[in-house]
């Protein structure tokens, strides 16, 4: 009979099989009331599942991350319950958990309107407030199939036929008259599912295949309590204000249009930000001793067949042909960098060789996934590739890590989560090689005092990798940086160097990305700063304004003086009230506004205001220039007097 060991090391002995709920009741009524599920020997199970042998048990509550995921998953079933009551002929497809919520794909003979979604949410609340028990039943594959055939649930039948073994026992979850199929676990009672909101609808092909029927996807969010739900909705509201697409239009940074889906038309001010970001990256490349190269954006398909990209990636590649040859527009820079490395004999003395490129890449992303600057088809990668010996891996990874943190800190990103992905089951190379490579990555992180977590088995078949995920001011995660070891591509493309023993050897290749893509990172920065770019990045850093025409000559002189000092400056000599001009340039997020009246002309000074509405008073022009140059040169995140 089972001995149950709890997280604090205490044990409970039973003379019969028990469920997590039984153990929770044994500990106390408060824990039983909070019990959502259990973790038995590391595996999540329903609160009602029986434990027949000795086991480690943790009771899962709404305070646990797993508990919140279970609540969200059960809310997806609640959505199914409600939609079948409102529109009984709906066919249910899949309803998984996603970040911050859930969705359900449904086949419905009507297009859902906003009023429909509101009615659906209302019915969900009515059902949840009944606090009914969710009943789990394990059945045979045949019984599950018969259940869904009788109910006309063709998508569930398809899942059983194509994804579930005939000797398996699927879990059926009964919500009163509604039944759904799932691995679980789910909440034992709907009292846990009171704090949710339906967010939006979208189209989605069954199984993600455009040859299949288009379904309607209903998105929702769910939380453990009302406070958490409201906080999330407030974050969404703030995120909407910061939407880079909205700000990009307000500030005239760029636009997209139907004739070039997923391609960016950079306007002058947006391109200024792009170029300043390039200058910053180039400064760091020089500091960390990288070469900068430029490869062709299109190469013969034969090369992509050699690399393996054609076999595994061809659906995402744009192609064209000329003179009976097929060409691929590059989706990434690495094969081109190997071609550059292969020019001329290389010695171990030439390594490490660090090769960077602002590579113009294209990927045939599905049109439905395109999203402003965040998901595009044409983008500029800031990646680099380091060719080195196995002995140099640790030092080179160390340098990559320092560069990542050096660059992220410039933009004020402090919360960075790091994950180390290790060898998958299918891989190339010996265990000894993987042992050393994984150890090199781990030691490099440890030497930099960087906490990290392992993602076991999540590495690529050709090498382990480190992923850097930064969190913005709204605590949203953006996976940008990677350091990926590659033991395959150099060999596939016949890269070699002459070692100390005068024998030819294959170099290790380190793929290194920091920003990810210039376009996406500018989108991230636009939302992080809400368009209030630090002065060094701002397209226009200073606007000088006159009050009347009598100061026009003085304004023009100052404009030229600041421009000669390397400051991006504009003069506003329009015959408008000064308050109107200030408001307009404040809305344009111009960091500094210099106002010139008769008093300033006489004294040779300027009245300085910031875009945040702070009046810095009258200042000497040379002093203003000197302080602005220092702020720009240091790439400060703060303005004067902040």
Curated annotation (Swiss-Prot):
Zn(2+) binds at residues 334, 385, 511. One of its GO terms (biological process) is threonyl-tRNA aminoacylation. Binds 1 zinc ion per subunit. Keywords: Acetylation, Aminoacyl-tRNA synthetase, ATP-binding, Cytoplasm, Ligase, Metal-binding, Nucleotide-binding, Protein biosynthesis, RNA-binding, tRNA-binding, Zinc. It is found in: Cytoplasm. One of its GO terms (molecular function) is tRNA binding. Its cofactor is Zn(2+). Residues 243-534 are annotated as: Catalytic. The modification N6-acetyllysine is found at residue 286. It comes from the Bacteria. The keyword Aminoacyl-tRNA synthetase applies. Residues 1-61 form the TGS domain. Catalyzes the attachment of threonine to tRNA(Thr) in a two-step reaction: L-threonine is first activated by ATP to form Thr-AMP and then transferred to the acceptor end of tRNA(Thr). Also edits incorrectly charged L-seryl-tRNA(Thr). Belongs to the class-II aminoacyl-tRNA synthetase family. This is Threonine--tRNA ligase. It comes from Escherichia fergusonii (strain ATCC 35469 / DSM 13698 / CCUG 18766 / IAM 14443 / JCM 21226 / LMG 7866 / NBRC 102419 / NCTC 12128 / CDC 0568-73).
């Amino acid at each position: 009979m089972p001995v149950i060991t709890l997280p604090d090391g205490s044990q409970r002995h039973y003379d019969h099989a028990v469920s997590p709920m039984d153990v929770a009741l044994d500990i106390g009524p408060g824990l039983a009331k909070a019990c959502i599920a259990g973790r038995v020997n590391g595996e999540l199970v329903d609160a009602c599942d029986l434990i027949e042998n000795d086991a480690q048990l943790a009771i899962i509550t709404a305070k646990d991350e797993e508990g919140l995921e279970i609540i969200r998953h059960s809310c997806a079933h609640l959505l199914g319950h409600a939609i079948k009551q409102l529109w009984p002929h709906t066919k249910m497809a899949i309803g998984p958990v996603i970040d911050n919520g859930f969705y359900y794909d449904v086949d419905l003979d009507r297009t859902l309107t906003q009023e429909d979604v509101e009615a659906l949410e209302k019915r969900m609340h009515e059902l949840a407030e009944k606090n009914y028990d969710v009943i789990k039943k394990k059945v045979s594959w045949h019984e599950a199939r018969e259940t869904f055939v009788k109910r006309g649930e063709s998508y569930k039948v398809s899942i059983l036929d194509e994804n579930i073994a005939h000797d398996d026992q699927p879990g059926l979850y009964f919500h009163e008259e509604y039944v759904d199929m799932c691995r679980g676990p789910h909440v034992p009672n709907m009292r846990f599912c009171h704090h949710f909101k339906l967010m939006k609808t979208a189209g989605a092909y069954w199984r993600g295949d455009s040859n299949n029927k288009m379904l309607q996807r209903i998105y929702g969010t769910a939380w453990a309590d009302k406070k958490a739900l409201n906080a999330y909705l407030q974050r969404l509201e703030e995120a909407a204000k910061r939407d880079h697409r909205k700000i990009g239009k307000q500030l005239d940074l760029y636009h997209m249009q139907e004739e070039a889906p997923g391609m960016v038309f950079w306007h002058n001010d947006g391109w200024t930000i792009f170029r300043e970001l390039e200058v910053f990256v180039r400064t760091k490349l020089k500091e960390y001793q990288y070469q900068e190269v430029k490869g062709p954006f299109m190469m013969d398909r034969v090369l992509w067949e050699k690399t393996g990209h054609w076999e595994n990636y061809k659906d995402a590649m744009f192609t064209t042909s000329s003179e009976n040859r097929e060409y691929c527009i590059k989706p990434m820079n690495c094969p081109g960098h190997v071609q550059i490395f292969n020019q001329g004999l290389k010695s171990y003395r030439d390594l490490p060789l660090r090769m960077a490129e602002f590579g113009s890449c294209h990927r045939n992303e599905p049109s439905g996934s395109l999203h402003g600057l965040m998901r595009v088809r044409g983008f500029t990668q800031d990646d680099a590739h380091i060719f080195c010996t196995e002995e140099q891996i640790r030092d080179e990874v160390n340098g990559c890590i320092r560069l990542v943190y050096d660059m992220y800190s410039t933009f004020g990103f402090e919360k960075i989560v790091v994950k180390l992905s290790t060898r998958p089951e299918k891989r190339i190379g010996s265990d000894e090689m993987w042992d050393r490579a994984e150890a090199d990555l781990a030691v490099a992180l440890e030497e930099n005092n960087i906490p990290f977590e392992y993602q076991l088995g999540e590495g690529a078949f050709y090498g382990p990798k480190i992923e850097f995920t930064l969190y913005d001011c709204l605590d949203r995660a953006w996976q940008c940086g990677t350091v990926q070891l590659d033991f395959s591509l150099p060999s596939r493309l016949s890269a070699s160097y002459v070692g100390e023993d005068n024998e030819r050897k294959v170099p290790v290749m380190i793929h290194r990305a920091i920003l990810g893509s210039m376009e996406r990172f500018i989108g991230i920065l636009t939302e992080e700063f809400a368009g209030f770019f630090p002065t060094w990045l701002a397209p226009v850093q200073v606007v000088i304004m006159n009050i009347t025409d009598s100061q026009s000559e003085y304004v023009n002189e100052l404009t030229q003086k600041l421009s000669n000092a390397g400051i991006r400056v504009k003069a506003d000599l329009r015959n408008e009230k000064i308050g109107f001009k200030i408001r307009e340039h404040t809305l344009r997020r111009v960091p500094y506004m210099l106002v010139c009246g008769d008093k300033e002309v006489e004294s040779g000074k300027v009245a300085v205001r910031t875009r945040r509405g702070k009046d810095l008073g009258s200042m000497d022009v040379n002093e203003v220039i000197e302080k602005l140059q220092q702020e720009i040169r240091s790439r400060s995140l703060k303005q004067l007097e902040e």
